[in-house]
Amino acid sequence: MTEYGRRGVVGMGLAGGAALALGGCAPAQDGRSWPGATPTSDGRFAGFTEYVPVTLEIRTDLGRLDRRMPGVTISSAHWVMQYQQEQREVLPPQDRPIWIHGVMTLDPASTRALAEASSGKADPLPGIYPGLRQYVPEGKVFTTVPKEKADAILDIEHMMQDDPSRFESSSFDTEQVAVCADANLLIFIARERHT
């Protein structure tokens, strides 16, 4: 290879490296959330930290939540779920946990049990998926329920499988729970793992 050819190859390599480095400064594509980014200015909530490559559909069905939390009576719910992933994920979905965020209305007895187990004001509120924040009324006071107490009241130990005929089992663990006794509302962040 001639001297000129080597310089050309090195020059192209440097130019390509610079382009890649500067490409990281480009704005994110629409419909994507990056770790730490909170696309809403609602200061009541902690930052949303999950990577979401596409906008999630907000679900309102209760079946999956009722099966995961048999210790409470859910009247209505708005929730989302997605396999946990990084921007460049290498693990197949079935090998990753599922994160679930939700805002639920509970019956008064369920709310009372959670409120009695709470440990103080939730400030900030759990960093739920930004599309769910519209279902949390402003001006309401939420209290934090410690994980162990929330898990016991929600009775996650007795959760039911979606498909009992499958050999694999799931575990459901709450990570953050906040309750508003006045509005019978529960905000939660949970993870589900398949074994």
List each language-model region with its residue ranges.
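Short, surface-exposed loop and linker segments with low hydrophobicity and enrichment for Pro/Ser/Thr
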Residues: M1, R7, V90-I98, S171-L185
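Mature extracytoplasmic domains of secretory-pathway proteins
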Residues: G71-A152
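N-terminal export signals
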Residues: T2-E3, G8-P27
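N-terminal low-complexity, Pro/Thr/Ser-rich intrinsically disordered segments
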Residues: S33-R67
